[in-house]
């Protein structure tokens, strides 16, 4: 990016039918007015894993280091970065304060890795409200679940 003030906006969401159950994730990337939608499916997963997967895949879609505003309705995802949970988990060898292992370590570690090249603002949005792109992500993630359930009854 030539102009360091240019920001990529990434909206993410995950959905799960049952928890655990079949799940979908989606991300919408917006840069200079151009919108890219990506989404995917996992057979047996949880809503939190899908929220993390959406952020991972959104960041993996970037072709070079960027300034990013990443929007999610997942407190689990946003608070891990904004409240310093992730640093504490790393310092404590991926154990929570109650000494139990952090869930979804594989995805947290992958998310940290794909985050490294970027400057990211982690922004919480209200789910199922009037945020156009959060609602679009929710729809795309849910469509992934419906599509796979229909194809594999």
Swiss-Prot record:
Its EC number is 3.1.26.4. Binds 1 Mg(2+) ion per subunit. May bind a second metal ion at a regulatory site, or after substrate binding. It is found in: Cytoplasm. Its main location: cytoplasm. PROSITE patterns: RNASE_H_1. Keywords: Cytoplasm, Endonuclease, Hydrolase, Magnesium, Metal-binding, Nuclease. It is an enzyme of class 3 (hydrolase). The keyword tRNA processing does not apply. Gene3D superfamilies: Ribonuclease H-like superfamily/Ribonuclease H. GO terms for cellular component: cytoplasm. Mg(2+) 2 binds at residues 13, 138. One of its GO terms (biological process) is DNA replication, removal of RNA primer. Mg(2+) 1 binds at residues 13, 51, 73. Residues 4-146 form the RNase H type-1 domain. The keyword Hydrolase applies. InterPro entries: RNase_H, RNaseH-like_sf, RNaseH_domain, RNaseH_sf, RNaseHI. Its cofactor is Mg(2+). One of its GO terms (molecular function) is RNA-DNA hybrid ribonuclease activity. It catalyses: Endonucleolytic cleavage to 5'-phosphomonoester. Endonuclease that specifically degrades the RNA of RNA-DNA hybrids. Belongs to the RNase H family. Monomer. PANTHER family: RIBONUCLEASE H1. This is Ribonuclease H.
């Amino acid at each position: 990016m030539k102009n360091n003030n240019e920001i990529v906006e990434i909206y993410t969401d995950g959905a799960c039918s049952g928890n655990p159950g079949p799940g979908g994730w989606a991300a919408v990337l917006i840069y200079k007015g151009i919108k890219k939608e990506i989404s995917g499916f996992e057979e047996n997963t949880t809503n939190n894993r899908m929220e993390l997967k959406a952020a991972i895949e959104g960041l993996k879609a970037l072709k070079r280091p960027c300034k990013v505003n990443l929007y999610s309705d997942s407190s689990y995802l946003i608070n891990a970065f904004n409240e310093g949970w992730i640093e504490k988990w790393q310092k404590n060898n991926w154990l929570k304060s109650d000494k139990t292992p952090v869930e979804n370590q594989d995805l947290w570690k992958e998310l940290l890795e794909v985050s490294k090249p970027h400057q990211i603002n982690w922004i919480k949005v209200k789910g199922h409200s009037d945020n156009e792109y959060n609602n679009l992500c929710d729809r795309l993630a849910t469509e992934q679940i419906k599509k796979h359930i229909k194809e594999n009854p």
